[in-house]
Swiss-Prot record:
The keyword Ribonucleoprotein applies. Disruption phenotype: Dkc1-deficient larvae have smaller eyes and head compared to wild-type animals, opaque lenses, defective development of the jaw cartilage, bloated fourth ventricle, pericardial edema, and hypoplastic pronephros. Inner-ear development is impaired. Reduced pseudouridylation of 18S rRNA is detected in Dkc1-null larvae at 4 dpf. Residues 421-434 have a biased composition (Basic and acidic residues). Belongs to the pseudouridine synthase TruB family. One of its GO terms (cellular component) is Cajal body. Catalytic subunit of H/ACA small nucleolar ribonucleoprotein (H/ACA snoRNP) complex, which catalyzes pseudouridylation of rRNA. This involves the isomerization of uridine such that the ribose is subsequently attached to C5, instead of the normal N1. Pseudouridine ('psi') residues may serve to stabilize the conformation of rRNAs. Required for ribosome biogenesis and telomere maintenance. Pfam families: DKCLD (PF08068), PUA (PF01472), TruB_C_2 (PF16198), TruB_N (PF01509). This is H/ACA ribonucleoprotein complex subunit DKC1.
Amino acid sequence: MADTESKKEKKRKSKKISDEEVGDIQESGDFLIKPESKVASLDTSQWPLLLKNFDKLNIRTAHYTPLPHGSNPLKRGIHDYVRSGFINLDKPANPSSHEVVAWIKRILRVEKTGHSGTLDPKVTGCLIVCVERATRLVKSQQSAGKEYVGIVRLHNALENEHQLARALECLTGALFQRPPLIAAVKRQLRVRTIYESKLIEYDPERRLGIFWVSCEAGTYIRTLCVHLGLLLGVGGQMQELRRVRSGVLGEKDNLVTMHDVLDAQWQFDHNKDETYLRRVIFPLEKLLISHKRIVMKDSAVNAICYGAKIMLPGVLRYEDGIEVNQDIVVITTKGEAICTAVALMTTAVISTCDHGVVAKIKRVIMERDTYPRKWGLGPKASQKKMMIQKGLLDKHGKPNNSTPSDWKEGYVDYSTTKVKKGGEASAKRKRDESGSEGEAAAAAQDTSKTEEESKKEKKKKKKEKKQKLAEEAAAEAPAEEETEVTESAKKKKKKKKAKETEADSD
């Protein structure tokens, strides 16, 4: 008892601080948020793929229920890992890109493969080969920028090396290009942008120049070399070419050969060792590292996979610098890519709003039902389920005889309501304005009469057409008969002559 009384007295004393004392404390104390040298306990600078620097994202809410479904991209089972990955392949010279991709498909025993943009048979270098689920990102990779290192052969000698460097600088920006004579596409004029180019080395004796180019997807380096020769006035052609970067990945980012892929699959088949296969194939999330990120709650993931709108209440975190119509990636809390999307809100709008559509889905990447279905669990949906169980609604959730009038008036079924066309709505408005039912009936009769008249006219026209065709056929018939008679007479004469000749020979 004594302890409880002493505690109560302490509480009273703590509460009984006069306003004067509070004023003294506020005057004497230094109140400011001081800078701290302590590093945050959570350092995500070394986290993998899309979770890198996760702690630097803006927090909208930290409250969500984690679900045990899904997994970190690097810790997927080997079957899922292979079927949702890509290979940064060093394409060999001579086989075409399609041949190489077909060989990889056969080696890995998968159903679907795709690549990040064709390379000519003689060209080597980076070719991103996407496997199964990663083929959904092929289009975005094909339109990504590329970098090449090429060798140009000039037909005549130059005065100095600077001429070639100057000509390369001239050929930057938007250029007109027509595909080479031997090309798999229609040879029509097109505009392609060259972002940057520089001369690496020039050999005046052999008249060979090595250059580096960063350009838009679909640029013909062979055509660029021809233009370079024309600009210098000596003529030129491409001798050799290698792609050193395709989109996000370059030749220093774990480039593998065809032999590496074959050995990795052999190692897995015979020794059940999947480490080599995991070093050759990378998760598809690595292709999306350059995109801005939005993190969704686990309960919203499957709805997005089924095509639901990306709404603000489902957002956990979002990145700085998101602009409207910018391509972004929507991810889970485990770092898996759900879909690529086009942003409909900026970062500032996301931070100030509490409702609305954040982004429009561009391409869903994740398979459906990887996470459980969590829609239809709201108050209205739960009430509807209860009413179906009690028999107040039919099995499809539609009203029946025993449905209460409050439900019929208040509930809006969005699956059945359709947007009415402007013409129908305007006609109805006119009828409402005119008011009388008699006028509406008269209008209906008039329309029915006009429809009947139009039908009769159509029938008449059809009859007239038939008669004309019959007359034309009758006129042509006798002429055809005459020609047939003359042809038959000629045939008979020929037969007679043939018989006579046979008789003479006998």
